[in-house]
Amino acid sequence: YFNLNTVFLYPHSFNDSLEYKQQNSTITGMVGNGALFGKMFLSKPALHLGFSNSRDKQNVGIHEFVHLIDMMDGDCDGFPEKLMEYAYAIPWLNLIYKKIQEIKNSDSNIRDYGATNKVEFFAVASEYFFERPKMLKNKHPILYEKLQLIYQQNTAEIRVDVNIRKKDLCPCGSGKRYKRCCLP
């Protein structure tokens, strides 16, 4: 990321002034701009929680890195221009506005914070794309398709947390049982 020089891990959530243990310390992640350009600030407990629970569609690390991707064209606007051809601009923005309205009407399982604006929608939808891709593909197929285009990957087809037993066929494709093939 050309627009990231430093990542700061804070021991707790923090406030706009980057102070923690204050009454208004509710921020768990932030990408700097202006004088703080090139810096990312993350709450270490929130970061750990995001990666320890991959089913809640919430991950501050993913969320803040998506803001960096969004900012690669110079604007944090919910539209990653460097990753999408111009022909996709209007359909993408129309989809964002439609999905934000669904969230506001409680007609969506996308996290409420995504209705804040198109910038946060892109980050929240991306968390969903990486944490619960099969659910996103099932419940929001057009959104999944657009995010797949943006990120150039089909996350719904990635096998995660596969529990292989010794008697199962080996996932390497040899046709042998796992215990007689690739079992470490």
Question: What are these model-derived regions, one by one?
Answer:
Residues 1, 14, 19-55, 75-167, ...:
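Metalloprotease/metallohydrolase-associated module, dominated by Zn2+-dependent proteases
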Residues 4-7:
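Extended, charge-biased low-complexity segments
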Residues 9-13:
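A general secondary-structure junction signal
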Residues 56-73, 123:
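Active-site recognition of the HExxH zinc-binding catalytic motif
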Residues 169-171:
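Short cysteine-rich clusters marking metal-coordination/redox-active sites
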Residues 173-175:
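Extracellular repeat turn/loop positions enriched in glycine and acidic/polar residues, especially those
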Residues 182-184:
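Short cysteine/histidine-rich zinc-coordinating motifs and their immediately flanking basic loops
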